[in-house]
Amino acid sequence: MREYFFERVRPIVEKALHEGNHGDWPLITLNLDLKSEEPEHLAAIWQLLAQYQDWLTTAQRTGTIDRMETLEVRPVLVLTGESDAQKAVFYDQVAEGGKLFVFGAVRTNTHDPSAPPEGLAPNPADNYHRWWNNSWRVVEPEGQSKAGDWTVEKESRLSQLVRYAHGHNLWIRFYTLDGATKQELSCNGWFSSYNFGSREAVRKRWEAAAKLGVDYIASDQYEELGALLKSLRPNRATTKPNPFSSRLAIRAARLGPEANFVSRVVMEKPIAKESQWQRKTRGQ
């Protein structure tokens, strides 16, 4: 992960640190999708993060997890999963007064994807758990490949989930929104279960997610998604606030020689408006 991620983004991060925060930090979100959780594995990740801590968005570890401490925002934000094994290393073993380098997801009840938001994620954010990771099935329970038309009712469901997340001080992420041909699926090794079947179908979901304030959108078609999100942003020369808070998710297919260290990494570039980000850092 050092060579694959940190050293590759070094020029971006060092330039950002030199120029200072202009309201667009964090520039990069590193989402750790861990496929094994041996204590030694997690400890090695923590030790690596500590070496780059000046780059990382952090919060102070206090005596109570319930209180969300203000984030010290830096160019990189690191997110991880919801497991207790990860929390044990990334939060429990951090000394009081120390820094949290990585933030976990709240636990999601996946038994009924159509359940009300409070049934899916009953726990609010805390000092460690700051985001909510969702399969798209919580919006369209039949799944991407059988989703059918995008409707007013589906958009209302998506809006309900986003409002619930933000009302509980959580960033919200959905995975994975693709609209590829069969040939593209075959050539790239993408999962058919994540595929809406056409550009038109997935674009409607991308646009709705951006409009409603979804914080992270995961897609294998990151270049097209990025272009769409960029087109939805106001001209930099204007003074109008950015109404969108979606982030571009770039899925890395493999980690090469360190694949046994971290099974998959997702790098996500935020385009959130500053005011919403600041509210989240304060837990307000």
Segment roles from a protein language model:
Residues 1-283:
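Catalytic cores of phosphodiester-bond hydrolases, prominently lipid phosphodiesterases
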